[in-house]
Amino acid sequence: PARQLDLPPCKSRRADAFITVKGEQTDMKDVKVLIGNYGSGKSELALNFAMQAAARGDRTELIDLDMVNTYFRLTERGKLVAQKEIRLISPNFACSGIETLSLPAEVASAFALDWDSVIFDVGGDDVGATALGRYHRDFAALPEGALEVLNVVNIRRPLASTLEKVLHLQEGMQTHARLRITGMINNTN
């Protein structure tokens, strides 16, 4: 039998609807992908973006695809996320002490279900970005303007301390994720 999804209630709908080619009106999904080097602050930013979206009344899904950094997981913030009515999807076995993680099937719900805002927290290098590449066709099917892929940069991190290093990391992440980075966030502290 099909597994029942526990979806947060929809408090309000966003006003930025668009018309499809067939003339049907549908809500525009806001999808943010935060990608960047290990220790750049992606997970905290992803959490903050999700909390802002939920505060607006958006049905919000937060997806932890960070398969690289097992030291900080969004799963550890599960209680806070649940209080804000944000649906959190984390790698299988996250926070269990098992080092080999796998992606849950629920990640596909970001594309199949009617979420207003979906935020992806993606691994800290080109290897971590490979997990995202599995969904490149789903991202390509999103309406124009619905997707932002943001490279989070902290120049205090050794692998991102120069422009050349940042651009080298970005090139590898774009290649492995099969997505073009559309903007950068300077998260240097």
Where in this protein do the model-derived segments appear?
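Conserved lysine of the Walker
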Residues: 42
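Hydrophobic positions on the alpha1 helix immediately C-terminal to the Walker A/P-loop
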Residues: 45
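N-terminal phosphate/diphosphate-binding loop that engages ATP/GTP or pyrophosphate donors
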Residues: 52-106
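Conserved catalytic-core segment of NTP-binding enzymes
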Residues: 126-189
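Walker A (P-loop) phosphate-binding loop of P-loop NTPases
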Residues: 39
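Switch II (G3) loop of P-loop NTPases
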Residues: 92-95, 117-131
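Hydrophobic anchor at the beta1->P-loop junction of P-loop NTPases
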Residues: 34
